[in-house]
């Protein structure tokens, strides 16, 4: 006999919605728990089975915490700006707003059908003007603090698409979408000064309960390095070139210098003989993205400028080259090359036959670069010193001679914040005809996106908003001065930088959120989502949070106390699910055939939450069979009422022990996100219960409570079958008694001359004499020692009896 999942699930979803079961009230008497999911981008494809994995995990925690008496905040919303909606709109002539709304409705329906306990009154949508009013407000605060500025930077410009592309959108010098040529060109862009927060973003990672791998990715992305800036003069010119190096101790081994092709001095120092070669190389490099240029495996290319620099430490002339592996955006856009002790420089020197000079002993320079430590050689006042000593001494020398200085640099660049697109938050800035600019007055926010029938890129490097003349042109009501609005929009990251704050007070029209509520709910207690957001989203959100902390808006230094990344659900063939492979599993189909509770249980039981595991229909069927067994255990198949097996009583000692062990184990495993192990223990209890004639009512009730976070619809139905009114959602979580966890009896091993002959059960606190007596009374032991003389009996309490007899 199995239960009707369609009937039960729609009944309880309706009940939760009508009764607002999961609405979060402000209640000062209870401890808070804030469980957050990474909100989804509502794509046209709808939800896939990967989404519910993380959502089910946070839902189990939220439901358990409610039953443990916590005041739980568990919200959901939509990260709805972005390129796909805009591209769809351009391709079909429809509005991105309508497309987005339709997708959100699909996502909401699908998510509700999975029975997650969200407070839907707190739903946010990044494309709602009442929401992005505050995204714009934060931008204005960044601008006022000097953290938002306009700069001319080299970007990936695609003439055919008429827009700038992110590095990730460029493959082999062509646009990922459509395969059009892409060129590097300098353009004015909005930048956010995240570099100003680099040290704090690095240091505060120590305080977070995050996976070490994610912390490391952020550390590497920020890329703090200590070293020195060294100034080289250019032979025959007044110009100097500054380089940053983490190894100033190897300065005596610098035999050439490399500039980024875009470095501002290249044209000035290139000799007439080398001009043509330099120009054509610069053209060739202009089509490559930073990622392609710095790939370690690629062949080294470069051109000599004809100019020489003077090595400040020994006065030697070193040739100045240009090469694409040096980026103008990184460090100073120039490097001193020490081929004997750097792999890239070594390859370059070998390719172009440049001198290689050993200054740290320990390697075989004829074969490869030596990057290890060792006594310095060929280095005058550094000879014999180790790396650390030599770095220290060289920095002292450079500073004394005014040829360099100690310096810390970061790999982290300022955040390129503007997009030449329509479907994003308008940047609230006005450019005036006299060359000044100002932000839109805060009382005029939100600055809404104008409705446009034609949203093709303008092709001029501006967004389609440049064509919305009525919206674009403004006049200062006080001075009569004319101005133009900023036409760039914000990137998709903007709205997701602070959404967790808006959930706390989503209808507040006066501020982001009430400070008292922020104080109560922050930081987020658990944040679950995919590892693909390890760097960008999490770093950007931490940056904005720190700015808001400095402004006194938020009370904590960090937004997310604990972070957890769920694994990926792969197709049955162990490949990533994708439409092109035809291996995508649609949750709607599973909910229809097996039920939402089965899907939730299966995704939590597949394996560890952070592992990537292949989908298995057999596993799904197994999950459903378990829920059917639970139903049959508690419900009489003829009457559809509570099973006659359920009685008011104590139950057997074995079952009592299994029950208390289950409560303890499930509680601990769920707390630690080991859902697969906790579910295994629920199965152990069900197996034990099936062996018994009777099942005590209090155990049946406790078991249903333990099951309820994983399979909430079925648990609600069983709770009502056990004679209760209303919902199980706020019933107290079961507790266990240590006294019943202890087993009264133990199994001991009996040996004859060290060989196992039998196992016997004795009382846990049996004396040595009682253990010996039980061992000698065993039939198999009697046979074994028959006719022999017992010389000695060795007893290890609670473990073993060894009879020495011959």
UniProtKB/Swiss-Prot annotation:
It catalyses: tRNA(Leu) + L-leucine + ATP = L-leucyl-tRNA(Leu) + AMP + diphosphate. It comes from the Bacteria. A motif ('KMSKS' region) lies at residues 576-580. GO terms for biological process: leucyl-tRNA aminoacylation. It holds the Pfam family tRNA-synt_1g. ATP binds at residue 579. SUPFAM superfamilies: Anticodon-binding domain of a subclass of class I aminoacyl-tRNA synthetases (SSF47323), Nucleotidylyl transferase (SSF52374), ValRS/IleRS/LeuRS editing domain (SSF50677). Its EC number is 6.1.1.4. One of its GO terms (cellular component) is cytosol. GO terms for molecular function: aminoacyl-tRNA deacylase activity; ATP binding; leucine-tRNA ligase activity. Keywords: Aminoacyl-tRNA synthetase, ATP-binding, Cytoplasm, Ligase, Nucleotide-binding, Protein biosynthesis. InterPro entries: aa-tRNA-synth_I_CS (IPR001412), Leu-tRNA-ligase (IPR002302), Leu_tRNA-synth_edit (IPR025709), M/V/L/I-tRNA-synth_anticd-bd (IPR013155), Methionyl/Leucyl_tRNA_Synth (IPR015413), Rossmann-like_a/b/a_fold (IPR014729), tRNAsynth_Ia_anticodon-bd (IPR009080), Val/Leu/Ile-tRNA-synth_edit (IPR009008). CDD domains: Anticodon_Ia_Leu_BEm (cd07958), LeuRS_core (cd00812). A motif ('HIGH' region) lies at residues 40-51. Belongs to the class-I aminoacyl-tRNA synthetase family. This is Leucine--tRNA ligase. It comes from Halalkalibacterium halodurans (strain ATCC BAA-125 / DSM 18197 / FERM 7344 / JCM 9153 / C-125) (Bacillus halodurans).
């Amino acid at each position: 006999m199995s239960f009707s999942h369609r009937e039960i699930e729609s009944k309880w979803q309706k009940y939760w919605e009508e009764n607002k079961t999961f609405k979060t009230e402000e209640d000062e008497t209870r401890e808070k728990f804030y469980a957050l999911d990474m909100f989804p981008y509502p794509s046209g494809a709808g939800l896939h089975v990967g989404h519910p994995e993380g959502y089910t995990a946070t839902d189990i925690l939220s439901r358990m915490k409610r039953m443990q008496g916590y005041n739980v905040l568990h919200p959901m919303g939509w990260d709805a700006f972005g390129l796909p909606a805009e591209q769809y709109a351009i391709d079909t002539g429809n509005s991105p707003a309508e497309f987005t709304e339709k997708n959100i409705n699909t996502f909401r329906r699908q998510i509700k059908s999975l029975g997650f306990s969200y407070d839907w009154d707190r739903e946010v949508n990044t494309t709602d003007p009442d929401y992005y009013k505050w995204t714009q407000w934060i931008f204005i605060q960044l601008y006022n603090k000097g953290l938002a500025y306009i700069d001319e930077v080299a970007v990936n410009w695609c003439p055919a698409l008429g827009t700038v592309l992110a590095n990730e959108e460029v493959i082999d010098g062509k646009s990922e979408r459509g395969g059009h040529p892409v060129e590097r060109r300098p353009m004015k862009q909005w930048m956010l000064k995240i570099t100003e927060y680099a040290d704090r973003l690095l240091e505060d990672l120590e305080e977070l309960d995050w996976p070490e791998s994610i912390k490391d990715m952020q550390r590497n992305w920020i890329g703090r390095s200590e070293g020195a800036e060294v100034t080289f003069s250019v032979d025959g010119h007044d110009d100097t070139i500054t380089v940053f190096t983490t190894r100033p101790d190897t300065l005596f081994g610098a035999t050439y210098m490399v500039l980024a092709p875009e470095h501002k001095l290249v044209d000035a120092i290139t000799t007439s003989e080398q001009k043509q070669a330099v120009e054509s190389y610069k053209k060739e490099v202009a089509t490559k993205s930073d990622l392609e240029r710095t790939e370690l495996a690629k062949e080294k290319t470069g051109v000599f400028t004809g100019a020489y620099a003077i090595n400040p430490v020994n006065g030697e002339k070193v040739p100045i080259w240009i090469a694409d592996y040096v980026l103008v955006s990184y460090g100073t856009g120039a490097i001193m090359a020490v081929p004997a002790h750097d792999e890239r420089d070594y390859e370059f020197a070998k390719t172009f036959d440049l001198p290689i000079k050993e200054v740290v002993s320990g390697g075989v320079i004829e074969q490869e670069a030596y990057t290890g430590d060792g006594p310095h050689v060929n280095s005058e006042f550094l000879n014999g010193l180790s790396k650390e000593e030599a770095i220290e001494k060289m920095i002292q020398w450079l500073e004394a001679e005014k040829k360099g200085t100690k310096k810390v640099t970061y790999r982290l660049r300022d955040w390129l914040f503007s997009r030449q697109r329509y479907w994003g938050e308008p940047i609230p800035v006005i450019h005036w005809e006299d060359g000044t600019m100002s932000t839109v007055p805060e009382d005029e926010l939100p600055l809404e996106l104008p409705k446009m029938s034609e949203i093709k890129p303008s092709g001029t490097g501006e967004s389609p908003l440049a064509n919305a003349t009525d919206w674009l042109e403004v006049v200062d009501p006080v001075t009569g001065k004319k101005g133009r609005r900023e036409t760039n929009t914000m990137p998709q990251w903007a709205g997701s930088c602070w959404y967790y704050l808006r959930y706390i007070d989503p209808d507040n029209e006066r501020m982001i959120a009430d400070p008292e509520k922020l104080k109560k709910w922050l930081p987020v207690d658990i944040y679950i989502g995919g590892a693909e957001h390890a760097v960008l989203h999490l770093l950007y959100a931490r940056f904005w949070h720190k700015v808001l902390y400095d402004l006194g808006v938020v009370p904590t230094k960090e937004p997310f106390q604990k972070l957890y990344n769920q694994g990926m659900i792969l197709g049955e063939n162990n490949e990533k699910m994708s439409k092109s492979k035809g291996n995508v599993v649609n949750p709607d189909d599973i909910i229809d055939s097996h039920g939402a509770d089965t899907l939730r249980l299966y995704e939590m039981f597949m394996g560890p939450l952070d592992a990537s595991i292949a989908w298995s229909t057999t596993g799904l069927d197994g999950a459903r069979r378990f829920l059917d067994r639970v139903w049959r255990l508690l419900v009489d198949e003829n009457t559809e009422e509570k099973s006659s097996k359920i009685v008011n009583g104590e139950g057997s000692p074995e079952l009592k022990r299994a029950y208390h062990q289950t409560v303890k184990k499930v509680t601990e495993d769920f707390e630690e996100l080991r859902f697969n192990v906790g579910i295994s223990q629920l199965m152990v209890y069900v197996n034990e219960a099936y062996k018994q004639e009777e099942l005590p009512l209090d155990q049946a009730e406790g078991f249903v409570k333990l099951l309820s976070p994983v399979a909430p619809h079925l648990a609600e139905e069983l709770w009502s079958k056990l004679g209760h009114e209303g919902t199980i959602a706020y019933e107290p979580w079961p507790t266990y008694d240590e006294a019943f966890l202890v087993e009264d009896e133990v199994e001991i091993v009996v040996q004859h001359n060290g060989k196992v002959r039998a196992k016997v059960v004795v009382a846990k606190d049996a004396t040595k004499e009682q253990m010996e007596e039980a061992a000698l009374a065993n039939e198999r032991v009697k046979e074994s020692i028959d006719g022999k003389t017992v010389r000695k009996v060795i007893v290890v309490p609670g473990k073993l009896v060894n009879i020495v007899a011959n």
